[in-house]
């Protein structure tokens, strides 16, 4: 592997101007392309501290054997050159928004004498109008099948068209009136082209005019007593309305825009794009990409910039030869692109996109109204796509087996870790400190073995020590394991579960070297030597192993796209989720505790009944004993105890001896009353 010092540029030789650079491997292949406002500052960052780079970036620098750069005049030129080089060289270390398939579009061949409708994939061609993309080819066929009863345009291939012209007999679609049969002269070329033009107008959003014209024709046919034609027009209008229902209006102002949203984690990011034309969603696309791991290249701003550059660069190339005819629905670059955040290069991106479009393009972050609501919908789609991607990868048996084998090989374990346990600590400024323990067996969660822990020794009075908390939870978990192993007969007799009798093959803690060393020290004290311990740091691919001799070893680096790292990520995330849920529950219980908690015999159910009956504690304080006893399950004694707990003096029970001062007050009151004139 090349040494970066052998190809590092000489000091002062790198220009400070903006430009684009590329790293090459020993075989001369380009492995990474980047751009920078200052080439010197950016390139020096790759060589200043190799150990401080993200693992993926460090691997790139160690793989490369040379670096070269090109100075440009503006950042717009840098954007264009970066895109061209990524497209040309396909560097392995760059983020690429590759499709796992080619998305289909609906093509209308206006360049033919008798235009036809067809499903199409590939580069755009001159004289052809395109609608889409669609997520599935069947969605195009369904739309065409619905609309050809209204607009009976040709859908057959050139060979089929020629054959039916020779035999002078239309195909089945011609017989059922879903094709105007220009092949046998049922309509002229001009009439058929008008049918196709109306079809295109409908898909382009000019629906109101077409429906209004058909309604006028239907009314005229009815007045002429041509009820058969009126019924056919009525059915056609219904078919058009059903087609419109499939594309619900999402932006009432008829906006043409692409709405982009992201969902990401430490390793990957999912992006979704909704194509809105004429206020309706005309298409949708999605990708899941691997993140580089470099902090500056994992931000949402960077992901947005890279996506806009690559996606619209590719779209412009596909649409470069097409004849949009000024039609907004066919233009690959819309007037607006709605994004979650604006990158630093927003001005340059707008200029570049405007050049691709041929008119102004605006990047916007939706703040309110329909656009904001649609952006949230697209984001939910991105989150769902990322979750589905992760579940699909984790749920596959082959992938799970590969993940366990990957962990075994990378950690040097004797056997595959069939049982993995992970602990995580959760608290807010030292209060309500709790821990979770989750269990995965054969790569799948075993939720019946999950456990919560309330931290006792390492927390309290607003203090929290994560390292000590890790040690406490580890001690309690494995102390229970040893006890269950020593008392199997008693445990079975009492009917208790043997959940803690099974030790994990791999014990994972959330943290770095201090946390993992604390857990290992506890296992050593307990004499447990057959459990491997690791720690997961914030950089997920850095896996820490115990080292109790005081030195600071380098972490084990997992490949970012390995199945083993995916499984460890799922285990860590599940432990974090479980700890957070318990912490929130405990904090909520503490914060909502009231004076009613101290009333003996008043359980949670009756406390809720009291608050529900009176609406609030304030109204409960104003209630009398008799009013409180109206609540089911509350007696007079409990009602008095409730008032006492709320600081309200309750009247004495009937027959009880009144205090002396109370009696004197009553006598005075009686004397006063006796002197009131009758």
Swiss-Prot record:
Composition bias of kind Low complexity appears in 649-667
What sequence ranges are listed for the domain GIY-YIG?
16-95
An example Gene Ontology molecular-function term: DNA binding
Q: Does the keyword Acyltransferase apply?
A: no
- Domain UVR, chain residue ranges per copy: 208-243
Which stretches does the entry tag as region Disordered?
649-678
Please provide the record's keywords in A-Z order. Cytoplasm, DNA damage, DNA excision, DNA repair, Excision nuclease, SOS response
Q: Which GO terms describe its cellular component?
A: cytoplasm; excinuclease repair complex
User: Does the keyword DNA-binding feature in the UniProt annotation?
Assistant: no
Gene3D superfamilies assigned to the protein according to its UniProt record, in alphabetical order: 5' to 3' exonuclease, C-terminal subdomain, GIY-YIG endonuclease, UVR domain, UvrC, RNAse H endonuclease domain
SMART domains per UniProt: GIYc, HhH1
Q: Which GO terms are recorded in the biological process aspect for this UniProt protein? A: nucleotide-excision repair; SOS response
Instruction: Return any one Pfam family short name.
Output: GIY-YIG
Q: Which domain of life is it from?
A: Bacteria
Q: Where in the cell is it found?
A: Cytoplasm
Signal peptide (UniProt feature, chain positions):
none
Q: What does this protein do?
A: The UvrABC repair system catalyzes the recognition and processing of DNA lesions. UvrC both incises the 5' and 3' sides of the lesion. The N-terminal half is responsible for the 3' incision and the C-terminal half is responsible for the 5' incision.
Subunit field text: Interacts with UvrB in an incision complex.
The similarity annotation says: Belongs to the UvrC family.
Name the NCBIfam families on file: PRK00558.1-5, uvrC
The record's annotation in HAMAP family points to:
UvrC (MF_00203)
Kindly provide the name given to this protein in its UniProt entry.
UvrABC system protein C
Which lineage do the record's taxonomy fields give for this organism?
A: Bacteria, Bacillati, Actinomycetota, Actinomycetes, Mycobacteriales
Q: Which gene encodes it?
A: uvrC
């Amino acid at each position: 592997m090349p040494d970066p010092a052998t190809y590092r540029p000489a000091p002062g030789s790198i220009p400070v101007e903006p430009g684009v650079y590329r790293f090459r491997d020993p075989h001369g292949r380009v492995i990474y392309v980047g751009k920078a406002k200052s080439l010197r500052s950016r390139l020096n960052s790759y060589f200043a501290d190799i150990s401080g780079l993200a693992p993926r970036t460090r691997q790139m620098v160690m793989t490369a054997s040379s670096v070269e750069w090109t100075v440009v005049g503006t950042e717009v030129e840098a954007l264009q050159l970066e895109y061209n080089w990524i497209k040309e060289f396909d560097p392995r270390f760059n983020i690429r928004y590759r499709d796992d398939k080619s998305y289909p579009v609906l093509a209308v061949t206006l360049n033919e004498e008798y235009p036809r409708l067809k499903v199409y994939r590939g580069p755009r061609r001159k004289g052809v109008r395109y609608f889409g993309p669609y997520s599935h080819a069947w969605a195009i066929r369904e739309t065409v099948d619905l609309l050809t009863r209204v607009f009976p345009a040709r859908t057959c291939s050139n060979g089929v068209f020629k054959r039916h012209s020779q035999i002078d007999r239309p195909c089945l679609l011609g017989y059922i009136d879903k094709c105007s049969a220009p092949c046998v002269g049922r309509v002229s070329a001009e009439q058929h082209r008008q049918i196709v033009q109306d079809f295109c107008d409908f898909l382009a959003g000019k629906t109101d005019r077409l429906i209004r014209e058909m309604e006028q024709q239907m009314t005229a046919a009815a007045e002429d007593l041509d009820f058969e034609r009126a019924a056919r027009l009525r059915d056609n209008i219904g078919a058009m309305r059903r087609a419109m229902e499939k594309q619900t209006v999402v932006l009432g102002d008829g906006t043409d825009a692409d709405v982009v949203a992201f969902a990401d984690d430490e390793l990957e990011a999912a992006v979704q794009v909704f194509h809105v034309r004429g206020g309706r969603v005309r298409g949708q696309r999605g990708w899941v990409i691997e993140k580089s791991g470099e902090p500056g290249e994992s931000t949402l701003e960077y992901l947005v910039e890279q996506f806009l550059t690559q996606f619209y660069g590719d779209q412009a190339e596909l649409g470069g030869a097409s004849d949009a005819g000024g039609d907004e629905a066919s233009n690959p670059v819309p007037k607006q692109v709605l994004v979650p955040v604006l990158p630093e290069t927003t001005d340059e991106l707008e200029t570049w996109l405007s050049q691709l479009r041929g008119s102004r393009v605006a990047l916007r972050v939706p703040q309110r109204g329909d656009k904001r609501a649609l952006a949230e919908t697209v984001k939910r789609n991105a989150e769902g796509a990322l979750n589905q991607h992760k579940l699909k990868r984790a749920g596959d048996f082959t992938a799970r087996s590969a993940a366990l084998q990957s962990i075994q090989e990378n950690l040097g374990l004797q056997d595959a870790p069939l049982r993995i346990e992970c602990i995580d600590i959760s608290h807010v400024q030292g209060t309500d400190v709790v821990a979770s323990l989750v269990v995965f067996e054969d790569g799948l969660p075993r939720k019946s073995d999950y456990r919560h822990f309330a931290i006792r020794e390492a927390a309290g009075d607003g203090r929290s020590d994560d390292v000590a908390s890790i040690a406490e939870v580890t001690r309690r978990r494995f102390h229970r394991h040893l006890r269950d192993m020593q008392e199997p007969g008693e445990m079975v007799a009492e009917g208790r579960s043997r959940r803690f009798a099974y030790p994990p093959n791999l014990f994972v803690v959330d943290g770095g070297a201090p946390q993992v060393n604390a857990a290992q020290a506890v296992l050593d004290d307990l004499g447990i030597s057959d459990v491997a311990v690791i720690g997961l740091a914030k950089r997920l691919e850095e896996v820490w192993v115990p080292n109790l001799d005081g030195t600071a070893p380098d972490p084990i680096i997992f490949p970012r796209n390995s199945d083993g790292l995916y499984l460890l990520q799922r285990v860590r995330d599940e432990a974090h989720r479980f700890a957070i849920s318990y912490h929130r529950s405990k904090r909520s219980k503490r914060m909502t505790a009231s004076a009613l908690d101290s009333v003996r015999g008043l359980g949670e159910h009756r406390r809720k009944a009291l608050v529900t009956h009176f609406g609030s504690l304030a109204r409960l304080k104003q209630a009398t004993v008799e009013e409180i006893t109206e609540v089911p399950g509350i007696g007079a004694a409990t009602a008095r105890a409730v008032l006492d707990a709320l600081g309200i003096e309750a009247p004495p029970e009937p027959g009880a001896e009144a205090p002396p001062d109370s009696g004197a007050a009553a006598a005075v009151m009686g004397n006063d009353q006796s002197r009131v004139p009758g």
